[in-house]
Amino acid sequence: ALSNKQIMFNLTEAQLFRPVAKHVTLNSFLPVLFQKSAVLKRNEAVMVRIGVVGYGYWGPKVVRNINDTDGARVTAVSDLNSDARKRAQRAYPFIGTCSDYRDIVRSPDIDAVAVITPVATHFEIAKSALENGKHVFVEKPFTCTVSQAEELIESAEKRQLKIMVDHTFLFTGAVRKIKEIITQNGTLGELYYFDSTRVNLGQFQHDVNVVWDLAPHDLSIMDYLLMKNPDALIATGQAHFNHDLEDVAYI
């Protein structure tokens, strides 16, 4: 069975980020940094300069989307893998690269940092970025523990910085349409049951189980649609390929 600590983290993650969840996408993230209602244009004087830490599987997609977003430009990429850095340079010759993420978080020429690395490294990198005055965009899952998540939120609030998690499904047309139907003056009626299944998606992770890897998607959708906290839960799981990490789970 999955531990209570593991399951409660995922539920708490959705609850913690309710106040900022609407700002998760890049198009929403950028105006928030400068307290503007309209998306910044590339020809405006202000351009959000973003450093991306991690250029493995998901990092290239984040870099592409940032560079396709008005008002933003990736100016630096950090990755421990030299081949990954070379790929970034070939794709974007104007981007600087480095092996040490500290070079990015300490740079005065970077406004915000996107953390696209294994979850075990999220806390250290995000904390360092905040301490160096950078806004932070973190790939899900946010951190490894509730205490780490709360510490990062407190650090951001103390410094009046933005920190948010990449709950991408909250901005898909289907999820937003469901939200619209649910909230349309009771047109649908009272919602009694919510069921979500996520199967056969991607590789097995070496550092987190399937709940930590995939459940944040479903839990963030549930939190967005229902806006209610759970009263109780039951969870079970099994590990078939790695005896320490469950690859099948039911909550």
What do these predicted regions represent?
Residues 2-14:
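Extreme N-terminal basic, low-complexity initiation segments
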Residues 19, 143-205:
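A contiguous active-site-proximal alpha/beta segment in oxidoreductase catalytic domains
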Residues 29, 42-92:
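N-terminal Rossmann-like dinucleotide-binding module
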Residues 62, 92-155:
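Beta-loop-alpha module in the N-terminal Rossmann-like domain of NAD(P)-dependent dehydrogenases
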Residues 201-251:
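Rossmann-like dinucleotide-binding domain that binds NAD(P)(H)
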